[in-house]
Amino acid sequence: MFKFKPLVAAILTVATAQAFAANNTSEQDQLGINNVAQVLQSGGSGNLAKQGQSGFGNQATVEQSHSRETTATQSQAGNYNVADAQQSATALTAATQNQRGWGNDATVEQTGTYKTGATQNQNGIHNVAETFQTGTTTSSATTEQTGKHNYGLITQSAAINSQGKLVQDGELNNASITQTASWGDRALVDQRGTDNDAHVTQVASLGSIAEVEQVGWRNDAMVSQTGHQHEAYMLSDGNNNRVDIDQSGNAQNAFALQYGNGNDSRITQSNSPFGGNNTATTEQFGTANEADINQHGRNQTAKTIQHGGFNVASVDQQGRGNELHFQQDGVGNELNAVQNGSDNEIVGVSHGWHNSSDIEQTGGDNLATVRQEGTLN
């Protein structure tokens, strides 16, 4: 008859701790398979819940509510472990989760909190880390993943001065940050490796900032913003990377910078009838890069700078007061710019071979100045 060794004798062990006063501390350590650890703390201040598990298929849960200066720390080593931390109606709270292995799942939920922080660290493959913050003030969420086939998600809604940061190093990772109906929110995605995807979505927000930085090959990055006073910064360094920025609202700014070969950049901005002051900038260095800028509204400025060969820049501006300043250096560059409205201006310089400029302006007081140097421009 098969028997478990002493090291895994903690199989199917359930540990539960409940506390309803101040300065409570609960520490749980488990070794084995399919262990379950639970901590429930409510009220008071200075509560601490610390859980450590090593093995396979373990589950750790912490619930803290109606308290201040509370801390939840969960550490798991092994495979197919689950860590869940829930904090509600708390102030000055922090939740930290550390996992090593593969197939692990970490979740942090913070609701109605003030000055909350969530930190998740995962090392391995096929891990999932998710953070949900709702109705929070001055909240922050940081997720760091190392390995491949990992998924990181940060969702912040109805928040003030929220910040989400996702860092991934490896291959075939997916990072997603969603911020909804928030004020002064900020999203940062940093990816290193190959075949990674980054998505930042900021919906109905005011003063939102999105930053995406990717270094490697065949990475895709997309930013979508709706609301007022947006800023999007994207840096893509490597080969065959793609950048997509979509902004809708007023007072938008988009900046995309790419290094390498075969890069693709696209910026789309749309305004309300009374909006304006949008800016779109793309800078590309390398070979076979593309830049596409599409603006609707008023008082917009588009700037594209391309160095290298086979670059293509296409700009479409509609409205009034638009300006475009472009510079192309290299071989086989092409620019197509269309402006509709009044007070539009296009000024550009093309250096190299086989450059082509096609400019169309409709309206009044438009100015187009293009200088081409080289052969067969």
Task: Report residues per predicted region.
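Gram-negative bacterial Sec-dependent N-terminal signal peptides
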Residues: 1-22
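Tandem repeat domain/solenoid detector
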Residues: 23-376
